[in-house]
């Protein structure tokens, strides 16, 4: 695999990808470079060939990628990687795929994976919609996790939120029947939108009933996003959906 960043970290991000939804386009995250620490830069230089997946826009055989058949869990927007690392440490029988656009977060997790010798984890530094549409086969995933996505809390920016109908339908296609979607947010308004979208998406059933949430499952640790939200007086909503 090639290093997605040269030693100067100068790769220009591609144009954001979109999913058409009527007359409106739903955008995934925009690649964000951020600042590298020397350790994070070394992570890309030294760890990416082992744990990274270079996006090429072609369907991928995930069992071949990991060298085994196992349940496949995708986390979209893993941030600093704490939740993914926790899951990989506590259930190594599963294979984990992470997508994150913030390069320093990717670098941090690369170093952690090397420390853990976690060869059952692979990372993308790319647009989530492009990865799902072009590299993940329909029915290839057992679970999709989306923890604390950007709430775009200003009303005029709500349309930029990730959980839109077109994106939910894309996730349904990639989950096998019997698979699971787990979302978490500390913004009540975003939880309301998630219910609006996901409860109405064919192929998804809310495990807690319409407009319901569940207690934080033991496979999701309390993240720094969650802690920050609680300090601001926000609640936290975990939404769990089964793929029919």
Swiss-Prot record:
Signal peptide: none annotated. Residues 1-22 are annotated as: Disordered. Substrate binds at residues 154, 186, 223-226. The keyword Protein biosynthesis does not apply. Keywords: Methyltransferase, S-adenosyl-L-methionine, Transferase, tRNA processing. CDD domains: AdoMet_MTases. It comes from the Bacteria. Pathway: tRNA modification; N(7)-methylguanine-tRNA biosynthesis. GO terms for molecular function: tRNA (guanine(46)-N7)-methyltransferase activity. Its EC number is 2.1.1.33. InterPro entries: SAM-dependent_MTases_sf (IPR029063), tRNA_(Gua-N-7)_MeTrfase_Trmb (IPR003358), tRNA_methyltr_TrmB_bact (IPR055361). One of its GO terms (cellular component) is tRNA methyltransferase complex. Pfam families: Methyltransf_4. S-adenosyl-L-methionine binds at residues 75, 100, 127, 150. SUPFAM superfamilies: S-adenosyl-L-methionine-dependent methyltransferases. It catalyses: guanosine(46) in tRNA + S-adenosyl-L-methionine = N(7)-methylguanosine(46) in tRNA + S-adenosyl-L-homocysteine. The active site is at residue 150. Residues 156-161 are annotated as: Interaction with RNA. Belongs to the class I-like SAM-binding methyltransferase superfamily. TrmB family. Catalyzes the formation of N(7)-methylguanine at position 46 (m7G46) in tRNA. This is tRNA (guanine-N(7)-)-methyltransferase. It comes from Stenotrophomonas maltophilia (strain R551-3). The lineage of its organism: Bacteria, Pseudomonadati, Pseudomonadota, Gammaproteobacteria, Lysobacterales.
């Amino acid at each position: 695999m090639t290093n997605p960043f040269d030693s100067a970290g100068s790769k220009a991000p591609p144009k954001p990808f979109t999913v058409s939804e009527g007359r409106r386009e739903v955008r995934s995250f925009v690649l964000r470079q951020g600042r590298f620490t020397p350790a994070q830069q070394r992570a890309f230089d030294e760890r990416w060939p082992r744990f990274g997946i270079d996006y090429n826009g072609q369907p991928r055989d995930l069992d071949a990628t990991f060298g085994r058949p196992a349940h496949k869990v995708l986390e979209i927007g893993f941030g600093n990687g704490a939740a993914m690392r926790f899951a990989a440490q506590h259930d190594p029988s599963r294979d984990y795929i992470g997508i994150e656009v913030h390069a320093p977060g990717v670098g941090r997790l690369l170093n952690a994976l090397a420390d853990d010798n976690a060869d059952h984890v692979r990372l993308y530094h790319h647009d989530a919609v492009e990865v799902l549409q072009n590299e993940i086969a329909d029915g290839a995933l057992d679970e999709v996790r989306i923890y604390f996505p950007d709430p775009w809390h200003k009303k005029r920016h709500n349309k930029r939120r990730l959980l839109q109908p077109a994106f939910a339908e894309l996730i349904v296609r990639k989950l096998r029947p019997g698979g699971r979607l787990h979302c978490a947010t500390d913004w009540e308004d975003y939880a309301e939108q998630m219910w609006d979208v996901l409860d109405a998406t064919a192929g998804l059933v809310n495990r807690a009933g319409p407009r319901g949430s569940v207690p934080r499952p033991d496979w999701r640790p309390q993240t720094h996003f969650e802690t920050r939200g609680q300090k601001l007086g926000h609640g936290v909503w975990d939404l769990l959906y089964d793929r029919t």
